[in-house]
Amino acid sequence: HIIRNKIVYLLHLSFILILSGALTTHIWGIQGNIHLRQGETPVTTFNKNDGQKADLPFSVSLKQFQLTYYQGTFAPMDFISILNVYDGPQMHEGSVSMNHIYTYRNYRFYQSTYDADKKGSTLSIAYDPYGIALTYTGYAFLLLSFILFFFDKHSYFRKLLNHPALKKITVCILLSTSVITMFGASVPPSLPKETANEFGKLYVYYNDRICPLQTLAKEFTTKLYGKSNYKGLTPEQVLTGWLFFYEQWKQEPMILIKDKEVQKLLGAKGKYVRLADFAGSTGYKQEQISPSDMNAKTTRAIEEANEKFSLASMLCTGNLLKIYPYFDKNNAQPIWYSLTDDLPVSMPHEQWAFIRYSMNLIAEKVAHQAYNEVKILLDKTKKYQQKEARGFLPSDTRFGAEMLYNRMNFTRPLAMFSLTIGILSFFLYCWKMAKQRNSSKKQNSILLAMLGIVFIYLMILIGLRGFISGHLPMSNGYETMQLMSVCAILLTFLLYRKFEAAISFGYILCGLTLLVSMFGESNPSVTQLMPVLSSPLLSIHVVTIMLSYSLLAFVMLNGI
């Protein structure tokens, strides 16, 4: 009881410290911003958030501002301000970036924004030495009290953990899922699989990064059709089909439109429409709808349909395929062009002709079914890419890892498998509880072994995605749901000895989270992170939140 009371006192003390820190920050904390320019005299004042001026006990100037990019692209990776701080006779140098705070005499400098000419920087300033110290101390005590609570033998948590009611479940969950698969009567013309795969091995500038064309093909197919393959064709076959057999593919009902109003507007009989359905005798059909007839839902659905129409149109014109790098000595890195882009006048004529006509030559060979010659031309194109963008391309290992990831990433069947096994094992567990029979150790071992295989598969996917992107894969809903699936499996292995139903719950939670991630997979992209999102602390925060959600889900299922 004495130990438990100490834990309770520590818990209440943590709340007092946290609230005291917040009050201290509100009353005595100072926040504002300061604008600095390279080459200007040091600044001794800054603007507070209330509009008033405040003095600094030192002066600060901007020595240099740096804007760094992801390799081979123009996507910003970080904003860095290098400062000179003058305090009496002393001069200190410090740097501020999106994920690095510079602190001097309890003044904290944060990177906020920068000037268009990249010669100036705006920094946020915070001065709150006492509020921060009180708040952080309070959170440390709060965490310590929670940990001590679980180790207290007389706590209600330990009593509930061994309570017989924990092992009885009175309500069964009924979850029915259905998978509807559509196959057309005929397959549209396409390249042989081997030839299409050679296209997938080209480099392409897409989503502000350089990746295999296979990635673009998969995301193009998924964006239009909702799945990564169409009528048994690979994503590369779909993409090259649209590129070289446009007249036939525009008649294919493969563009997914979910909204009934948009389906009616396009004259479609189902949820899949043709590209040809977007245009009528009087022009583009979606421009004919009156704004007064559009609500927020319809407007959003029309925008999504327009996006798919534009994506298909960009591919068919070649504008989507930025596969031709050109390195100008006046630029720090190569610029990637499509065959329809305006090319710089400084480009040599031979290079200009290659970019303008190489794809036309490939199309001619495709028309004559000279696929061996197509492969030779694709090899020449890739050699041109490697020569012109040398030093700016992803490594062969990373390039191969991305192609492996594209071939391995099948979330839908894994989600359905996990849900099916989870529901069946849950019903079996309930039946054995009703019959007062013990579960078979062999059965549990098989279930755990299969769950272990799912865990390894997910970890490989997450590892590949992290290696490809160059950051921890926790930056969007798709990635965080994958992480939550892993957390659910880990909790299953930790809890199943004390709580047998955790095996079924682990499968169900894994399946449900993967099912949710499928919504993100309908528009997935491995992109460069905005600088503020690449913080290790933010990644730790996401892991903690996902783990807590997994625990909460176990508690919810246990309550049912």
Feature names for model-found ranges:
Residues 1-560:
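Solvent-exposed, non-transmembrane regions of integral membrane proteins
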